[in-house]
Every structure is written in structure tokens, then in C-alpha cells.
Amino acid sequence: MNNWERMKAGRLYNADSKDLEQYHKFGMETCDKFNRTPLWRKKRKQRLLEKLIPSAKDGGAAIFAPFYCEYGVNIHFGKGCFVNYKCTFLDCAPITLEDGVWVGANVT
């Protein structure tokens, strides 16, 4: 089991390992693109969000920028979730929000 698999499983892993670098870079870069995309480019914002957090597809989540996370793929949304401005999700372990969960502004 590599460090990526260990991290996703919530097990002990080496955070400095080279095998995590590509995933971390992807998450940080995609988050940055999402945050810099203007509000009026809704389709682009949604595509970036779905790329970062696959469970955000089909109305799984609405997120107001700025939004920050480390990997994205470790975040799981139920239907109809909402995340307000300036939230930070440290998703080195799985984060799951059930259906209808709303997260207030400035939450970490």
C-alpha cells in the first residue's frame, strides 16, 4: 500500500512522500483556478469543482469562493450541500458531508 492509499484509508502515512506530491499539486492548483474564475463563468467554475471534488457532480454541492483544500478527492458531498465563503477543508483524511449539509463562512 503506497502513501496515497494509506492517507485515503485514514491510516498512518508519510506526508512528505514523493507519491503524494502530484495529488497535492493537483488539488492546490485546481483550487486556485476555481477561486480565480469569475462568478459569471458558472460552467467553468462547476467543471473545476467537479474535477477537484468528483461528488460535487449533479447538484452535489454549491461552493462559494474562496475555497481551500489539499487534495479535493478526499471530500465527499451528499445532495444539496452548500459551503459558504472562505472555508478550508484539510482533507488528508476523508471528509463526508451528508445530504443537505450547509457549512457557514470561515469554517476550517
Predicted segments, located by residue:
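Terminal amphipathic alpha-helical/low-complexity segments used for targeting or macromolecular assembly
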Residues: 1-60
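Left-handed beta-helix
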Residues: 59, 64-65, 70-79, 83-85, ...
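Glycine-rich, pocket-lining loop/helix-strand segments that form or immediately flank
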Residues: 108
